[in-house]
UniProtKB/Swiss-Prot annotation:
Belongs to the AKH/HRTH/RPCH family. The modification Threonine amide is found at residue 10. The keyword Lipoprotein does not apply. It is found in: Secreted. The keyword Secreted applies. The modification Pyrrolidone carboxylic acid is found at residue 1. GO terms for biological process: neuropeptide signaling pathway. This is Hypertrehalosaemic hormone. GO terms for molecular function: hormone activity. Its main location: secreted. GO terms for cellular component: extracellular region. Hypertrehalosaemic factors are neuropeptides that elevate the level of trehalose in the hemolymph (trehalose is the major carbohydrate in the hemolymph of insects). InterPro entries: Adipokinetic_hormone_CS.
Amino acid sequence: QVNFSPGWGT
């Protein structure tokens, strides 16, 4: 799971 600032990798 790679959640940065947006909602990628959810």
